[in-house]
């Protein structure tokens, strides 16, 4: 269901975002806080509240991004229709889509693609940029994904009696989930799953360390 509204890179990116935030909280408390005075319920509420808040923020930013993209597309179509020559129009499309640098096709195929794109855009109907139902569902999915990543960290904090052990379990679970996201990511890009999982874990740990060091 998620991938009906979000691309795999978007959904996996949101999971990483949420896990990094949750790990920043639990690892930061373990490294910098006093575990003797730790109040599990307060920490769990703070952890979940942080992820829910940032999930909402990220969802709203997604909606703004969708509006911006549609507005930008409409502006490009209007600009394209004002161009006096076909050569200028093709140049504008080349600049907008930027496929030349990817070396995905031969020049003659790219030229045919740009001509077809020009024909489509010249006859495209311009609609007012607005938020659609699919955008709202995608934003909701983002809120759910980012919020859900707080659960693996919050559950041990609430259920394990020893705060030090609870934090170790929470951190271990979150690191395992980071690896799982990287492992799953590799399936979409044809990379080595184990290597990708380990790279994602290492990269995210570095980001968490930077966040903690800077007071985040």
Feature map (PLM): residue ranges:
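Transmembrane helix-loop junctions in multipass membrane proteins, especially transporters and channels
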Residues: 33-36, 62, 66-74, 158, ...
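Transmembrane helix-bundle signature of multi-pass membrane transporters/permeases
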Residues: 47-55, 143-147, 201, 205
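Transmembrane alpha-helical segments and their cytosolic interface motifs
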Residues: 10-19, 126-175
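Hydrophobic alpha-helical membrane-embedded segments
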Residues: 48-78, 82
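Juxtamembrane boundary at the C-terminal end of a transmembrane helix
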Residues: 208-216
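Cytosolic-side membrane-entry/anchor segment at the start of a transmembrane helix
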Residues: 1-52, 56-57
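Interfacial loop-to-transmembrane junctions
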Residues: 180-205
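Cytosol/matrix-facing amphipathic helices and coiled-coil assembly/linker segments
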Residues: 71-142
